[in-house]
Amino acid sequence: LFLQKALGGFKVDNMMFYVLNDFSDDEIESIAEKIQSEKERYISVNKLYVAVSKTNNKLKSLPKTYQIVLRMLRLAVRTDMTPMFYDRLEVKKLILAVDDISLLESIYNENLKKLEVYDRDNGTDYMSFLRLYLKYDGSVQRVAQETFVHRNTINYQLAKIKKILGNNLKTFEERFKIILAFEVRDVL
């Protein structure tokens, strides 16, 4: 049914794209979920990722929308979130709208890359630890409860992370830079 109302579709590598016309947001969500749930009937893949862009009323902005959907699909694969809807991405929508990929890369490189390299070279997982620490608004107690690790160990790991990053993580701005770098990393 939905293919009859589609303006068109095309395939790139192993991805299918449909340009839909005259669908409500609820109909699009229903279609995306139906494709996801019935994929086995039509194609033989282990995992199917569905990304739904924002509603676009201008034909000239289709190329930009296409680029955003490609980045959303990479994010869907990385986070195993499908179907993924642009309108539900919150902060990531802002990052997806940035055309200057080198700007996004520099935000990540300046604020978080050192820690990722350290993890890779030393077999640690400070990236996940830092993300959890930021998720709990810098509460050592909550991180200790969540990870079943003593607070002294948490404080030791934090000191190590702060030294690696050259960031004290005390002020809003210091934490925001790291949170933004994590969000950028998710999208790139």
What are these regions, as identified by a protein language model?
Residues 1-188:
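Cytosolic nucleotide-utilizing catalytic cores of signal-transduction proteins
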